[in-house]
Amino acid sequence: SITELCKTLSAGPLDPNTEVVVGCPAPYLSLARSLLPETIGVAAQNCYKVAKGAFTGEISPAMLKDLGLGWVILGHSERRAIFGETDELIAEKVAHALGEGLKVIACIGETLQEREAGQTEAVCFRQTKAIAAQVKDWSNVVIAYEPVWAIGTGKTATPEQAQEVHAALRKWFTENVSADVSNAIRIQYGGSVTAANCRELAGKPD
């Protein structure tokens, strides 16, 4: 449960050099924030691209800040696939969330079909390019590489596969944004990460 997870994280020990953020469903955001120390962040799993208006059911970055949150996850593959969110919409959401003072975990990643067709880099670059068109300051952005075929399927990208994409993304940032951003930006891997494989994944340079 979220309560148990929060208690485990609160008890630690955690690496003081590693930023820990818990992303949970909207109804439990206040609960998580109340159970965790300030040193651990809480992220919503989605928000909308405008501050206010008639968007019944949507949550704005301002509302998330009212709950004491500092983070939001945007562009998750399920939002793209199930709810039809486009690269452009996700980029607009990222820009608005950043403008409102939130930190953003922006998700990218290819499907199994795209990987088997040799399109992994093309898809990841396309998704990242849309975000880059809207972002001027990258200091509050984390890129999450989440191959769709490895999310909740039990299949995991090998550490080598993950590293290959992360390295390609850094090269893309160097060529299309700046070397400084490429060196500084955090790129994390998500997709069936377990206690058994996390050490090997974390050991990769990118």
Curated annotation (Swiss-Prot):
Active site: 76 (electrophile), 146 (proton acceptor)
Short name of one Pfam family: TIM
Catalytic activity: D-glyceraldehyde 3-phosphate = dihydroxyacetone phosphate
Record key words, sorted: Gluconeogenesis, Glycolysis, Isomerase
Example GO BP: glycolytic process
GO CC terms of this entry: cytosol
Pathway of action: Carbohydrate biosynthesis; gluconeogenesis; Carbohydrate degradation; glycolysis; D-glyceraldehyde 3-phosphate from glycerone phosphate: step 1/1
InterPro entries: Aldolase_TIM, TIM_sf, TrioseP_Isoase_bac/euk, Triosephosphate_isomerase, Triosephosphate_isomerase_AS
CDD domains: TIM
The EC number(s) this enzyme carries: 5.3.1.1
GO function terms (MF aspect): triose-phosphate isomerase activity
NCBIfam families for this protein: tim (TIGR00419)
Subunit-level organization: Homodimer.
Similarity comment text for this entry: Belongs to the triosephosphate isomerase family.
PANTHER family (UniProt xref): TRIOSEPHOSPHATE ISOMERASE (PTHR21139:SF2)
Name of the molecule in the record: Triosephosphate isomerase
Species, as recorded: Anopheles merus (Mosquito)
